Amino acid sequence: MKTAMITGITGQDGSYLAKLLVEKGYRVIGIIRSHHSSNLFNLNYLGILDKVTLEECDLCDLAFVIGLIEKISPDELYNLAAQSSVGLSFSHPTSTIQYNITSVLNLLEAIRLVNKPIRFYQASSSEMFGKVQTLPITLSTPMSPLSPYATSKASGYWSVINFRESYDIFASNGILFNHESFLRPKSFFVKKVISESMQIHFGHRDFLNVGNLDVKRDFGYAPLYVEAMWRMLQLDRPHDLIICSGESISLRSIVIHIFKKLGIDESKLRIDHELYRPVEIANIYGDNSSAKELLDWSYDIDFREILDKIIVEEMSSYKSPDEARK
């Protein structure tokens, strides 16, 4: 039986990845910061909380990380832990950069020092590229990070490459573009729009307040993206790959689709310039051809289908704001 170690297991990607690996017969060890602060909703929702083992670990403590990896001796290590909100990174740039960089370096250094054949996956981000001159984004596209979050992810990306080339570690970067599901936190755009639109639908909110809708993003479906993560660590040698849908969709069209699905008039939409980001990228989408070819991975689902899936799940679990606070 293979053993997989997942940092960030309670998040959207970590939970879906844990479910996939449990179904494949892995022993899954999830790394959390603290049992007291962890939100176990996602693991409960997917029915796997009792099928994984949770271990506390401060990823910024190298000695702790080394000891845990020696104890667990994983075959595969997926690093999905990060402060992953672009917006929040502008409010907390120092803590975002410190945590996102130090955690990656400590995991890589621990693997080097433990000196066991551990395969390492690093969750990288399309935000690293910033404002690009040509689309689609490929691995040869120059990086120009425009946020503290993007800066931290770019550093982690190059750290993986450095350790791979310097110490012959099986370490891969999966450069993921936006990917959504019902388990996405409500602080992210798509889930925020669906959640608040649901409140309008049920008469618990008057308007949807959003920032700049005149931007386009490459959105995908989280359960399919975690499958690509797993496939990356099954290759004969490590690769850095772009995991994306290969096309962009405007934020405005997403809002309009959700409103139509829920029968909400567009007059309920309010543009709030206070919600604009300090620096915004107009359009971004990636080239997933290498991932499809190397991983034998297919992605052909329309993002509107994903929105419909999330709406159905959100509808079935909806609670009014008052009920949610209880």
Give residue ranges: language-model regions:
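Amphipathic alpha-helical recognition patches that constitute DNA-binding helices
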Residues: 12, 16, 147, 184-188, ...
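C-terminal substrate-binding subdomain of Rossmann-fold SDR/epimerase-dehydratase oxidoreductases
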Residues: 23, 30-31, 190-191, 197-326
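Activation segment
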Residues: 63, 130-132, 183, 253, ...
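Hydrophobic alpha-helix immediately C-terminal to the catalytic Tyr-X-X-X-Lys motif of short-chain
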Residues: 151, 155-163, 192-196, 254, ...
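Transmembrane helix irregularities
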Residues: 180-183, 236
